[in-house]
């Protein structure tokens, strides 16, 4: 069997696994939103979407860097240079640590002030809103930590593991939604704390799986200035697209909160769930085929790389 035929079968299998994951998560997330809205109420659900959306604005930096990390890990994997692969992975983790420190400083210095002076929060819910801010920040850091591991998983085309872990995370989120229906504590704080716990457990699973299966996923404190500069240079182009999209989505969310209140945020939060689910249809196929394109190019199989680009368009 030719390499092209094997690659085509792998892409088809990976695409199928990603679509199974997507369909499951789409159904679960839409139902979870309904249960969470019922448990929190319109105002608290709106507060959650507005405050957590404020933290999501900082992901414009991490999103562009994540694309660079994924590209570099996949490219070096295609070259077959194991030593450089570990260097890329370790450099990626150092970059994520630096971003995490920067975001924490910005949120604690600016975010807390903005929340308590400019955002529209119902009377008596400022304490809960501040808890949401801090726990959403912690969840954001957990997600940053897992980015190089996720990139390695996709670069090695282990889409079945990626799908199963995603299904676990979606199921856990649904479990959290049912738990808060009978919460003895402040429902909003309890919900965000449990979501933070789910994020932590999921990231630990990603880390353990990658360390056991991929030799490059062992962190070593190495700093390659040239590689660091190259990764940030590549990320700069992704940053242009990321910042425009995220400012449009999350900036509107904050403006809605300031001028119309949390009830409008609740409605927009539900609409965003549907919009995100639909957008993932094309994204999943691209996720399945991108590693093959990058690895073919890295190994100087330019014709195969061009062929994959044309056939996947």
Language-model features: where?
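Interhelical loop/hinge segments that connect adjacent transmembrane helices in multipass membrane
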Residues: 1-11, 188-192, 206-250, 288, ...
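Signature of the first transmembrane helix
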Residues: 10-75, 104-108, 173-174, 233-263
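Hydrophobic alpha-helical transmembrane segments
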Residues: 21, 134, 163-213, 233-234, ...
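Residue-level recognition of pore/gate-forming positions within transmembrane alpha-helices
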Residues: 22, 26, 53-56, 91, ...
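Helix-loop junctions and terminal segments of transmembrane helices
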Residues: 63-79, 155, 214-215, 275-313
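Short membrane-interface helical motifs at transmembrane helix boundaries
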Residues: 104-124
